[in-house]
C-alpha cells in the first residue's frame, strides 16, 4: 500500500494566503484551464501580440516575441485603430473582458501593482516548491533575482462563460448568474510562430478568486487598469482524511477504467468485424443471421450466436461514437489517459510512494482534465474552491460517467438482442434506412446552416495536440513550416464563382488552408487580374476533385497542383510593410538619422533615398486630400481599410497547429482565432451580397490604400564601387531606414534563366524563381531586395563562349529592373503576372562595364569610390573599432539600450584606446592599397584579440596591470612587420626615360607606376651602318594590348614632331635631320616594374610618350611629377577615369608633389570637391559651385578653390594639359625644348 504524508499547515495558515494584483485575460473559446495541466492555445497574431505587449518591459531578450511585437505599432496611441479591422477590434475588446463600447483598443503595459503582484506570486510559488512555506510581502519583494523572462508572463485566465452551455437549459452559463469569481492563474511557458498564427503553451498553476469588496481592492483602485484584478490565492493544501478520500478516488477511477477498457474492446471488435465484413465476396450488408435454411446442428448454432455477438450495433450509437472519438481520437489524448491510469496503479502498488496533499489534489484536477467530461462539469470543478467540496464533486462525476458506460452497455445489449433475434427483415431494413436518412439530414443541416449559425457554434479543437504527461518543464516547440491562409473581408464578384467551392471538413489541414485561401482571400487580392484568379480557381477544382481519393485518385498532376496552390497561397498578397503608419507620416529626420548612424559619408546615396521618401510623403498628403473630396459613404468606409504602407497589415488567420508533441500534460489545442474566423465568414457572406448589387464599390477601400504607393515607382539603384566600401551594408541600412523587410539575392555565377524566372511546372521538382522566393521569405510585397554582384551574372558581356542552352539570365533581369514592366512580371512557375513595382531593388557591382548596355541603362548608377585615409580614420574610430571591441568579448555598455545616454558614457576606452597616429599607421603600413575597409577591420580585430588575451590574464591575476593603450610601437608586436613600401620603384635620382604614371587598380585603389625606357643607338655598335630603318620598340612588364597600342601611338607622335621640326637638339640649326637620323637608328626598350601584375588601359599614353621623348632628347624627367591621360596621333590629351583614386595613390607616394591630369577631367575634380564638402558635414556654397562650373568653361580659368583644396588635403599641386605640348612645358618649363613657341597652342594650368 502507498504511504500517506498528511502535512500539517496549521501553523502556517496565515502565511499561505495572499492577495496580489495580476493581469487578466478572457478566452474566446470554451476552454476551462485546470491547475497542473499545460494547454496549447492558438491565437491570432494580433491578439497574441496585444497580450504579450503588456509584458514588453520584461521580455526584451526573447527574440520570437520581439519579432512578433515589431509587426504592430502599439506605441502610437489610438491612431493604431485605423490599421485594424472591425473584427479584430471586437476581438480585443472581448479578450480584455470589456463591452464593445470600450474604446481603449491599444493594449498597455502592466501597472506597477501588477508587477509587484507577479513578484509576490512567484515568491510564494517558489517557496511552496522548496517547502519553505509563504513569506511576507517585504521579504518577497526583496528576492527577485530568480525571476526569468517567461516567469513574468503570469496572468489570471477568466473562463468564457458565454461559450459554455448548460445541457439542461441549452443556454450559456454566462446568461445566468455567475457561479463564482474563480479564475485560473497560469503562465505562458512556450511560444510557437507558424507564420500565420501564434500558439501559446499555458501552464495552469493554481486557482484564484477575484476580490471585489476588499480593502486591498480599494487600496489599488486608482492604480489598477481595466484588465487587472486583485486575486486571492490560498496555498493551503491540507486535505482532511487524505487516506479515505484517496482510496475512494482510486476505487472509483479503477472502476471507471475497467468500464472504459471494456467499452473500447467492444467498440473495436464491432468496428473490425464491420470492416472485415465489408471485404467479403458479396460485398453486401447481411441483415439476417444466416441463409434461409436453418441448421439445427449445435455447431451451427454456436457459429450463429458468435455472428450475432460480432455483428454489434455499437458503432451506430451516437453516444458510443462520441465517447470513442474523445477517448482515442487523439494519440496524445490516448497516451495521457494510459499514463494517468499507470500513475494510479503505481501509487497503489508502490509502498514507498508517498501521497501528500498536493499530489492528491493534482490527481483530482488531472482526472477531470483528461477524462471526457463536458466543459460545464470542468467549470464546476474549477469553481470548487474548497478542498472537501472538490473531492466530493470529482467522485460524483466519475460515478456519473461510470453510469453512462453501464447504461450504454445495457441499451446496446437490448438493441442487439432485438435486432438480431426478434426484428423482421423489414424492421431491420427500416432501422438502417432511418439511420441513413438521419445522417443525410444532419449533413445537409451542417452544410446549409453553417454560415448562419457559425457564430453560435462552440469551437472545437483546431487539431489534436493531445494530452501527455508533465514533468513540470516544457520548452517551446518548433513552428509549422507550412503557413496557412489569411482571411480578409471583401469580395470581387467578377473574379469567379467562389460560392461553388464547398468546404470539406474531412480533408487534411493543408487542403483546408488552401480552401480558405481560395474562398476568402483570393477574391480580395487587388493585384491579381480576373484571368489570373480564374486560372487559380480552375487548378483548385482539379485538386478538389482528386482530394478524396487515395494518392489523388490516380491523377498524376494532383501533387504538382497541390504544391503549386500552396506556393500561391504563401505569397503575401496585398501585404505592404513599412516603419511608418502611413505615407504622410514619414519622418524624414528619423530616416536621415538612421542612415547617418549606420554609414559615414555617402551623402549622394543618402540624398537619393531621402528624395524617394519625400515623394512618398507628398503622395500620401495628396491622396488624403483627394480622399476628402469623395462622397461620404466612401470616406467612411476608407477609415476602416488598412493602409498599404502601414505596419504589417493585420491578418485574420485560420487555425493551425504544430504537430510536435510536448512532453507534458497537454490538453488538445483550443483555437482562439475562432471568433475572428466566424466573424470573417459572416462579413464575407455580407460582402458577397453587396458585390452582386453594386460591384463597383466593393474594392474601393482596399484599392485606395494601395493607390498611394502605386503612384510612385520604387527606385532601382545600382551601387557601383570597389569591394569593401559598404555597398551591401548600405542596402541593409536602407531597408532599416524605410522600415521594410530585407532580402538578399546573390547573383554571382548564375547561368540559368530559370533561377530568375522560375522553372515551368512540367519539370520534376519545379520551384518559383529567386524573386518570388524572396517575396515569400519577406512576407510582404514591398521589401528591399538586394541583387548582389549583378555584374557577375553569366550572360551578356560575361558569356565568354558559354552556350545559351539555359537562356541568358542577364536578359531575364531586363524585365525585373524596368519600372515600366515589372508590375506585370511573369514567373514561369506561377504563370500569371506579379506586381513587383513596390519592391525597391538595389544592385551592387564592382565592374559595371561588364554588364550589357540595355541592363546598365535600366539602373540608376551611384558611384561609391574608394576611401582616403582620412575617411578610413573616421570610419575606424566611429564604427569599426567599437564593433570589434564588442565582438571580441569586452563588456562594453550598449548606449543604444540606455534610457538616458550621457556624453562619453560608453566604456570602450577602458578596454582599448588607439590614437589617430597609430590608426593612421595601421591604414598606411598594414592595409596599403585597399579601397575599402575590410582589411582595415581585420587588422583592428587582430589588435582587439591580442588585447582580449591580456585582459583575461589580468582578470585571472596572471599580470598585475592591464594597459588599454595601443601605440605605434606596439603594432609590430601585434601585427608583425608592415608591408613593404610601394615607393621602392619610384625612389632614386632623376633619370632619363624614367616617368611616373598613375593607375587605377582592379580593387578600386590607385597607385603610382614607373615607366622605364632605355635607348640604344645602332650606329655606335655598327660604325659602318650608314642609314637606319626606323626606331624599334620592345615593351615588357605583362602589358595589355590597349596599353601597347598607346605606346606605339606615342612613339609615332614623337616622330611626327620631328618631321614638323618642332623640337630643339644640341642648339644646332640642323635639328630635323639630326633628330631624324637618331630616331631611325634607335632601339627603345620600355619596361614597367612589378611584372607579375597585369597592366592595361589607355591612360598611360602620355607617360610613355614623354618617356620616349626623354630618351630621344636625352633629357631627364623630374621624379616628383606623376601624370595620366590618353594620347592621340595629333597629340591631344583625352580624359580618363578614376581621377580621385589616382590622386590618392599619388598622395600615398611621398616622392610625388605634382600631378598632371587631362584638362577635361577638371569637371570630375569639381564634382569630387563638392561631394567631399558635403560628406565632411560642411555647408556647400551652391553659388560657388555654379561659378566654378562657369569658370571651367573658359580656357584660362581663374578660380582656384578646387586646386587649393586638394593642395591642402593631399599636398599635391595639380596641372592640366589639353595637348602634349602642355606636358612638355610643365615638365621642362625652365628649358627651351620647343623650337617654335607659337606651336604651343595652350598654356599650362597650374596653381
Curated annotation (Swiss-Prot):
<dbReference type="GO" id="GO:0016485">
    <property type="term" value="P:protein processing"/>
</dbReference>
<feature type="domain" description="Lon proteolytic">
    <location>
        <begin position="989"/>
        <end position="1230"/>
    </location>
</feature>
<dbReference type="InterPro" id="IPR027065">
    <property type="entry name" value="Lon_Prtase"/>
</dbReference>
<feature type="compositionally biased region" description="Low complexity">
    <location>
        <begin position="459"/>
        <end position="477"/>
    </location>
</feature>
<keyword id="KW-0547">Nucleotide-binding</keyword>
<dbReference type="Pfam" id="PF02190">
    <property type="entry name" value="LON_substr_bdg"/>
</dbReference>
<feature type="active site">
    <location>
        <position position="1142"/>
    </location>
</feature>
<keyword id="KW-0576">Peroxisome</keyword>
<feature type="region of interest" description="Disordered">
    <location>
        <begin position="447"/>
        <end position="503"/>
    </location>
</feature>
<dbReference type="Pfam" id="PF05362">
    <property type="entry name" value="Lon_C"/>
</dbReference>
<dbReference type="InterPro" id="IPR014721">
    <property type="entry name" value="Ribsml_uS5_D2-typ_fold_subgr"/>
</dbReference>
<dbReference type="InterPro" id="IPR054594">
    <property type="entry name" value="Lon_lid"/>
</dbReference>
<dbReference type="InterPro" id="IPR020568">
    <property type="entry name" value="Ribosomal_Su5_D2-typ_SF"/>
</dbReference>
<keyword id="KW-0645">Protease</keyword>
<keyword id="KW-0067">ATP-binding</keyword>
<protein>
    <recommendedName>
        <fullName>Lon protease homolog 2, peroxisomal</fullName>
        <ecNumber>3.4.21.53</ecNumber>
    </recommendedName>
</protein>
<dbReference type="InterPro" id="IPR008269">
    <property type="entry name" value="Lon_proteolytic"/>
</dbReference>
<dbReference type="GO" id="GO:0016887">
    <property type="term" value="F:ATP hydrolysis activity"/>
</dbReference>
<dbReference type="GO" id="GO:0005782">
    <property type="term" value="C:peroxisomal matrix"/>
</dbReference>
<feature type="region of interest" description="Disordered">
    <location>
        <begin position="626"/>
        <end position="655"/>
    </location>
</feature>
<dbReference type="InterPro" id="IPR003593">
    <property type="entry name" value="AAA+_ATPase"/>
</dbReference>
<feature type="binding site">
    <location>
        <begin position="721"/>
        <end position="728"/>
    </location>
    <ligand>
        <name>ATP</name>
    </ligand>
</feature>
<comment type="similarity">
    <text>Belongs to the peptidase S16 family.</text>
</comment>
<keyword id="KW-0720">Serine protease</keyword>
<keyword id="KW-0378">Hydrolase</keyword>
<feature type="compositionally biased region" description="Basic and acidic residues">
    <location>
        <begin position="626"/>
        <end position="639"/>
    </location>
</feature>
<dbReference type="GO" id="GO:0005524">
    <property type="term" value="F:ATP binding"/>
</dbReference>
<dbReference type="InterPro" id="IPR003111">
    <property type="entry name" value="Lon_prtase_N"/>
</dbReference>
<dbReference type="GO" id="GO:0006515">
    <property type="term" value="P:protein quality control for misfolded or incompletely synthesized proteins"/>
</dbReference>
<dbReference type="GO" id="GO:0016558">
    <property type="term" value="P:protein import into peroxisome matrix"/>
</dbReference>
<dbReference type="Pfam" id="PF00004">
    <property type="entry name" value="AAA"/>
</dbReference>
<feature type="domain" description="Lon N-terminal">
    <location>
        <begin position="22"/>
        <end position="402"/>
    </location>
</feature>
<comment type="function">
    <text>ATP-dependent serine protease that mediates the selective degradation of misfolded and unassembled polypeptides in the peroxisomal matrix. Necessary for type 2 peroxisome targeting signal (PTS2)-containing protein processing and facilitates peroxisome matrix protein import.</text>
</comment>
<dbReference type="GO" id="GO:0004252">
    <property type="term" value="F:serine-type endopeptidase activity"/>
</dbReference>
<dbReference type="InterPro" id="IPR027417">
    <property type="entry name" value="P-loop_NTPase"/>
</dbReference>
<feature type="region of interest" description="Disordered">
    <location>
        <begin position="76"/>
        <end position="103"/>
    </location>
</feature>
<dbReference type="InterPro" id="IPR003959">
    <property type="entry name" value="ATPase_AAA_core"/>
</dbReference>
<feature type="active site">
    <location>
        <position position="1099"/>
    </location>
</feature>
<dbReference type="Pfam" id="PF22667">
    <property type="entry name" value="Lon_lid"/>
</dbReference>
<dbReference type="GO" id="GO:0004176">
    <property type="term" value="F:ATP-dependent peptidase activity"/>
</dbReference>
<dbReference type="InterPro" id="IPR027501">
    <property type="entry name" value="Lonp2_euk"/>
</dbReference>
<dbReference type="InterPro" id="IPR008268">
    <property type="entry name" value="Peptidase_S16_AS"/>
</dbReference>
Amino acid at each position: 500500500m502507498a504511504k500517506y504524508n498528511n502535512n500539517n499547515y496549521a501553523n502556517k495558515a496565515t502565511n499561505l494566503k495572499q492577495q496580489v494584483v495580476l493581469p487578466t485575460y478572457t478566452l474566446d473559446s470554451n476552454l476551462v484551464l485546470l491547475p497542473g495541466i499545460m494547454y496549447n492555445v492558438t491565437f491570432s497574431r494580433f491578439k497574441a501580440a496585444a497580450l504579450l505587449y503588456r509584458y514588453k518591459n520584461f521580455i526584451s531578450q526573447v527574440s520570437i516575441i520581439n519579432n512578433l511585437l515589431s509587426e504592430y505599432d502599439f506605441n502610437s496611441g489610438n491612431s493604431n485603430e485605423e490599421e485594424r479591422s472591425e473584427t479584430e477590434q471586437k476581438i480585443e475588446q472581448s479578450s480584455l473582458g470589456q463591452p464593445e463600447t470600450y474604446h481603449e483598443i491599444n493594449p498597455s503595459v502592466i501597472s506597477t501593482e501588477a508587477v509587484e503582484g507577479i513578484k509576490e506570486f512567484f515568491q510564494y510559488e517558489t517557496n511552496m516548491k522548496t517547502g519553505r512555506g509563504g513569506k511576507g510581502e517585504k521579504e518577497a519583494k526583496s528576492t527577485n533575482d530568480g525571476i526569468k523572462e517567461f516567469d513574468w508572463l503570469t496572468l489570471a485566465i477568466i473562463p468564457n462563460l458565454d461559450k459554455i452551455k448548460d445541457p439542461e437549459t441549452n443556454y450559456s452559463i454566462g446568461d445566468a448568474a455567475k457561479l463564482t469569481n474563480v479564475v485560473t492563474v497560469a503562465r505562458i511557458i512556450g511560444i510557437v510562430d507558424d507564420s500565420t498564427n501564434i500558439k501559446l503553451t499555458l501552464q495552469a498553476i493554481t486557482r484564484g478568486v477575484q476580490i471585489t469588496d476588499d480593502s486591498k481592492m480599494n487600496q489599488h483602485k486608482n492604480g489598477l487598469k481595466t484588465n487587472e484584478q486583485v486575486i486571492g490565492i490560498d496555498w493551503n493544501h491540507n486535505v482532511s482524511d487524505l487516506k479515505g478520500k484517496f482510496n475512494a478516488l482510486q476505487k472509483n477511477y479503477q472502476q471507471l477504467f475497467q468500464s472504459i477498457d471494456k467499452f473500447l474492446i467492444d467498440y473495436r471488435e464491432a468496428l473490425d468485424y464491420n470492416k472485415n465484413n465489408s471485404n467479403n465476396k458479396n460485398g453486401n450488408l447481411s441483415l439476417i443471421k444466416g441463409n434461409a435454411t436453418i441448421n439445427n446442428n449445435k455447431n451451427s448454432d454456436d457459429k450463429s450466436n458468435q455472428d450475432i455477438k460480432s455483428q454489434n450495433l455499437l458503432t451506430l450509437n451516437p453516444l458510443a461514437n462520441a465517447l470513442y472519438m474523445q477517448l482515442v481520437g487523439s494519440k496524445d489524448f490516448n497516451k495521457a489517459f494510459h499514463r494517468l491510469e499507470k500513475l494510479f496503479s503505481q501509487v497503489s502498488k508502490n509502498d514507498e510512494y508517498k501521497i501528500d496533499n498536493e499530489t492528491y489534489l493534482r490527481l483530482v484536477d488531472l482526472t477531470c482534465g483528461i477524462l471526457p467530461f463536458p466543459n460545464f462539469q470542468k467549470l464546476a470543478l474549477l469553481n470548487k474552491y474548497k478542498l472537501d467540496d472538490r473531492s466530493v464533486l470529482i467522485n460524483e462525476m466519475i460515478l456519473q460517467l461510470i453510469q453512462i458506460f453501464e447504461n450504454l452497455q445495457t441499451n446496446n445489449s437490448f438493441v442487439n438482442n432485438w435486432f438480431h433475434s426478434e426484428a423482421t427483415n423489414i424492421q431491420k431494413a427500416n432501422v438502417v434506412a432511418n439511420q441513413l436518412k438521419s445522417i443525410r439530414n444532419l449533413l445537409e443541416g451542417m452544410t446549409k446552416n453553417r454560415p448562419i449559425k457559425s457564430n453560435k457554434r462552440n469551437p472545437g479543437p483546431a487539431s489534436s495536440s493531445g494530452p501527455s504527461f508533465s514533468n513540470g518543464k516544457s520548452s517551446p516547440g518548433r513552428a509549422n513550416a507550412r503557413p496557412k491562409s489569411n482571411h480578409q473581408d471583401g469580395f470581387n464578384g467578377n473574379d469567379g464563382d467562389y460560392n461553388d467551392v464547398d468546404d470539406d471538413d474531412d480533408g487534411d489541414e493543408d487542403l483546408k488552408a488552401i480552401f480558405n485561401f481560395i474562398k476568402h482571400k483570393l477574391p480580395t487580392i487587388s493585384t491579381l487580374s480576373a484571368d489570373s484568379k480564374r486560372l487559380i480557381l480552375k487548378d483548385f477544382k482539379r485538386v478538389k476533385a482528386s482530394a478524396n481519393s487515395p494518392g489523388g485518385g490516380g491523377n498524376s498532376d494532383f501533387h504538382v497542383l497541390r504544391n503549386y496552390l500552396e506556393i500561391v497561397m504563401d505569397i503575401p498578397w496585398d501585404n505592404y510593410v513599412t516603419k511608418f503608419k502611413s505615407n504622410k507620416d514619414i519622418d524624414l529626420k528619423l530616416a536621415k538619422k538612421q542612415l547617418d548612424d549606420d554609414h559615414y559619408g555617402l551623402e549622394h546615396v543618402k540624398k537619393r533615398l531621402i528624395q524617394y521618401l519625400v515623394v512618398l510623403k507628398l503622395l500620401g498628403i495628396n491622396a488624403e486630400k483627394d480622399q476628402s473630396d469623395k462622397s461620404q459613404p466612401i470616406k467612411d468606409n476608407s477609415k476602416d481599410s488598412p493602409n498599404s504602407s502601414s505596419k504589417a497589415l493585420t491578418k485574420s488567420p485560420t487555425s493551425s497547429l504544430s504537430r510536435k508533441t510536448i512532453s507534458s500534460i497537454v490538453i488538445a489545442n483550443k483555437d482562439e482565432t475562432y471568433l475572428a474566423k466566424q466573424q470573417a465568414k459572416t462579413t464575407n457572406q455580407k460582402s458577397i451580397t453587396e458585390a452582386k448589387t453594386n460591384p463597383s464599390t466593393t474594392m474601393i477601400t482596399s484599392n485606395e490604400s494601395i493607390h498611394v504607393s502605386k503612384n510612385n515607382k520604387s527606385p532601382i539603384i545600382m551601387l557601383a564601387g570597389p569591394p569593401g566600401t559598404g555597398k551591401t551594408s548600405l542596402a541593409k541600412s536602407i531597408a532599416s531606414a524605410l522600415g521594410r523587410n530585407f532580402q538578399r539575392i546573390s547573383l554571382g555565377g548564375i547561368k540559368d534563366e530559370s533561377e530568375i524566372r522560375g522553372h515551368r511546372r512540367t519539370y520534376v521538382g519545379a520551384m518559383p524563381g529567386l524573386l518570388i522566393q524572396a517575396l515569400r521569405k519577406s512576407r510582404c510585397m514591398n521589401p528591399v531586395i538586394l541583387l548582389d554582384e549583378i555584374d557577375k551574372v553569366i550572360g551578356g558581356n560575361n558569356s565568354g563562349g558559354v552556350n545559351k542552352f539555359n537562356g541568358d539570365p542577364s536578359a531575364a533581369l531586363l524585365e525585373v529592373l524596368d519600372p515600366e514592366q515589372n508590375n506585370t512580371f511573369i514567373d514561369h512557375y506561377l504563370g500569371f503576372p506579379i506586381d513587383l513595382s513596390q519592391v525597391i531593388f538595389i544592385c551592387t557591382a564592382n565592374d559595371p562595364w561588364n554588364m550589357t548596355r540595355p541592363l546598365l541603362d535600366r539602373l540608376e548608377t551611384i558611384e561609391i569610390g574608394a576611401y582616403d585615409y582620412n575617411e578610413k580614420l573616421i570610419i575606424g574610430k566611429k564604427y569599426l573599432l567599437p564593433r570589434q571591441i564588442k565582438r571580441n568579448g569586452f563588456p562594453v555598455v550598449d548606449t543604444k539600450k540606455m534610457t538616458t545616454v550621457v556624453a562619453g558614457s560608453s566604456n570602450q576606452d577602458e578596454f582599448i584606446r588607439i590614437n589617430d597616429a597609430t590608426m593612421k599607421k595601421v591604414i598606411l603600413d598594414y592595409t596599403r592599397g585597399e579601397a575599402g575597409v575590410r582589411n582595415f577591420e581585420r587588422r583592428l580585430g587582430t589588435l582587439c584579440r591580442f588585447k582580449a588575451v591580456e585582459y583575461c590574464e589580468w582578470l585571472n591575476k596572471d599580470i598585475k596591470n592591464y594597459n588599454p593603450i595601443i601605440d605605434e610601437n606596439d603594432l609590430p608586436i601585434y601585427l608583425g612587420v608592415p608591408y613593404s613600401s610601394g615607393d621602392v620603384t619610384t625612389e632614386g635620382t632623376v633619370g632619363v626615360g624614367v616617368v611616373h604614371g598613375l593607375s587605377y587598380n582592379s580593387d578600386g585603389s590607385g597607385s603610382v607606376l614607373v615607366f622605364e625606357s632605355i635607348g640604344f643607338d645602332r650606329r655606335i655598335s655598327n660604325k659602318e651602318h650608314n642609314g637606319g630603318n626606323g626606331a624599334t620598340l620592345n615593351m615588357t612588364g605583362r602589358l595589355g594590348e590597349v596599353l601597347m597600342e598607346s605606346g606605339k601611338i606615342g612613339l609615332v607622335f614623337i616622330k611626327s614632331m620631328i618631321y614638323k621640326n618642332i623640337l630643339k637638339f644640341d642648339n644646332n640649326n640642323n635639328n630635323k635631320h639630326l633628330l631624324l637620323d637618331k630616331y631611325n637608328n634607335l632601339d627603345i626598350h620600355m619596361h614597367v616594374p612589378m611584372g607579375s601584375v597585369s597592366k592595361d588601359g589607355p591612360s598611360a599614353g602620355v607617360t610613355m610618350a614623354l618617356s620616349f621623348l626623354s630618351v630621344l632628347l636625352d633629357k631627364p624627367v623630374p621624379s616628383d611629377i606623376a601624370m595620366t591621360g590618353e594620347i592621340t596621333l595629333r597629340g591631344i590629351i583625352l580624359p580618363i577615369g578614376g581621377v580621385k583614386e589616382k590622386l590618392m595613390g599619388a598622395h600615398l607616394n611621398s616622392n610625388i608633389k605634382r600631378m598632371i591630369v587631362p584638362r577635361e577631367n577638371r569637371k570630375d575634380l569639381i564634382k569630387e570637391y563638392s561631394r567631399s564638402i558635403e560628406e565632411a558635414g560642411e555647408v556647400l556654397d551652391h553659388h560657388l559651385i555654379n561659378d566654378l562650373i562657369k569658370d571651367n568653361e573658359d580656357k584660362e580659368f581663374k578660380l582656384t578653390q578646387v586646386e587649393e583644396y586638394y593642395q591642402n588635403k593631399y599636398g599635391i599641386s595639380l596641372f592640366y594639359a589639353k595637348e602634349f605640348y602642355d606636358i612638355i612645358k610643365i615638365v621642362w618649363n625652365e628649358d627651351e625644348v620647343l623650337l617654335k613657341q607659337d606651336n604651343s597652342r595652350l598654356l599650362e594650368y597650374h596653381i
